C-alpha cells in the first residue's frame, strides 16, 4: 500500500538504516530492472554525469559489488564508523 510505503520511507530517513528499509533514492540506483527505457536513462547518467573516463569505470567496477551507483562519489551514501554528529 502506498501509505505504508510512505511511512516506511519517512521512518527510514529518521531512524537508523537497515538493509531492509526502502529509501526513495534507491529507485535511481536500481540495476534489477529489465526496462530498456530505464536502463537507457541509467546509461546516460553514467555516461554524462559523474565518472565517465575509462579509469573511472575501472575504478568503480573494482569496488567489488558495492551496491552504489558509480556516479555517486566515494562518500555518497556511506556510514561513518562511530562518529558523533551532535554533542
UniProtKB/Swiss-Prot annotation:
Entries under InterPro entries matching the protein: Homeobox_Antennapedia_CS
UniProt motif Antp-type hexapeptide: location: 22-27
Gene Ontology MF terms: DNA binding; DNA-binding transcription factor activity
Protein localization: Nucleus
Keywords per UniProt: Activator, Developmental protein, DNA-binding, Homeobox, Nucleus, Transcription, Transcription regulation
UniProt tissue specificity: In the embryo, expression is seen in the epidermis, somatic and visceral mesoderm, and the peripheral and central nervous system.
One Gene Ontology CC term in the entry: nucleus
Keyword Lyase: no
Homology family: Belongs to the Antp homeobox family.
Function statement: Sequence-specific transcription factor which is part of a developmental regulatory system that provides cells with specific positional identities on the anterior-posterior axis. Binds the consensus region 5'-TTAAT[GT][GA]-3'. This homeotic protein controls development of the cells in the posterior thoracic and first abdominal segments. It activates the synthesis of the decapentaplegic (DPP) growth factor.
Record-given protein name: Homeotic protein ultrabithorax
